[in-house]
Amino acid sequence: MSYKCSRCKRDVTLDEYGGVRCPYCGHRVLLKERGGDVKEVNVE
């Protein structure tokens, strides 16, 4: 799962680091990335 650090804005994956901390700056607030999927909904 991909996250973005709120301080340094770098991409972080928690699987490779193993904790809830940015490996670049040490900040503990990570924002979850949204998926790039676009959903179509029919409204009738």
UniProtKB/Swiss-Prot annotation:
It holds the Pfam family Zn_ribbon_RPAB4. Its EC number is 2.7.7.6. Keywords: Cytoplasm, DNA-directed RNA polymerase, Metal-binding, Nucleotidyltransferase, Transcription, Transferase, Zinc. It comes from the Archaea. It catalyses: RNA(n) + a ribonucleoside 5'-triphosphate = RNA(n+1) + diphosphate. Its cofactor is Zn(2+). One of its GO terms (cellular component) is cytoplasm. GO terms for biological process: DNA-templated transcription. It is found in: Cytoplasm. One of its GO terms (molecular function) is DNA binding. Its main location: cytoplasm. Part of the RNA polymerase complex. Belongs to the archaeal Rpo12/eukaryotic RPC10 RNA polymerase subunit family. This is DNA-directed RNA polymerase subunit Rpo12. It comes from Halorubrum lacusprofundi (strain ATCC 49239 / DSM 5036 / JCM 8891 / ACAM 34). The gene is rpo12.
